[in-house]
Amino acid sequence: VIMNNEDYLHAYKFFEEKYDRLDVNDFDYFYIYSDFRWFASKLAKNLTKNEFCLAVIKPLIEKNKTVIVPTYTYTVEGVFEVSETPTRLGTLNSWILQQAKVCRSEHPLFSFAALGPGASLVENCGKSAFGKNSVHERLVGKRACVLHIGKPIHLANTLIHHVEQLCGATYRTNKCFKTKVYQNGKYLGTDYSAFLRRRDVKGHDFHFDLERAAQKLYKTKIPKEIGNPKNLSNITLCDYDKLGNFFVESFFNDHSIFLSKEFVQ
C-alpha cells in the first residue's frame, strides 16, 4: 500500500531524482549495498521502515528494473530454510524478504533476494557462493550495476570474492558446509561452498581492505556518484562488468590489492 503522505512522496522523489541523474535507464539489474543512517536522518523522520524502503526501491521497480540485495545468514551448520531464515544484515536486507514477489537464492551462507521482472536470476544457483553459476557470475553481461546507497565503496564489495575465486587467489580456499538447505519444507541439498579466508598462515588473517583499490577506482570513469561517502550521503553507481574487469586487472597487477597486509605465497 502506498501512503500518499507528503513525507513518503518527498523521499520517493528524492531517490527518483538521484537515480535519473545517475542514468539508471542504462541498466536492468541493480545490486544494492545500503546503509540508511544518513538518509533516514534526513528523510525518514515520520516514515515507517517499510515506507522508507519503498521510497528507495519503488522508483527502480516502476522503471521495470530488477533489484538484488544480499540477505546473508552465515548458516554454517544445521538448517537453512530459503523461505524463512531471516538475514543477519540491515534494514533493506530484511525488508526485501518480506515482499510478496521476492525470489531468494539458496546459499546457506551468502543468499541474495531479488524483486522485479528479472528476479528469477537468483533462483536455482550452483552451490558455490561466489564461483560457478553463482549470482555474481550470472550478472556478467546482463546490463547490471552495483549501487551503493549510504555505503562507501571500500566497505562493501562481495564482487571481489568472485574475482579472487576467478583469478585463483592463494590466500582463500574453498570450504564446503554441511548445512541442510530446504525451500518451503522441500530438501534441496547440502555441501554448498564458499571461497573463504585461509586460517593456516601464521601472522596473516587475510582481512580484506578495499581502500587502495577504491582510490584507484575513483581515478577511472567507472563510479558515478552523488553525495559524499565520508558522511554516508552517497549514492554511487558502478557498471558491474566494468567494475569486475577493473578488479581482475587490479588483482593481476598486485595479488595483495584486496588485503590489509601484503601476502607473498
Task: Name the predicted role of every residue range.
Residues 1-265:
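N-terminal and secondary-structure boundary signal
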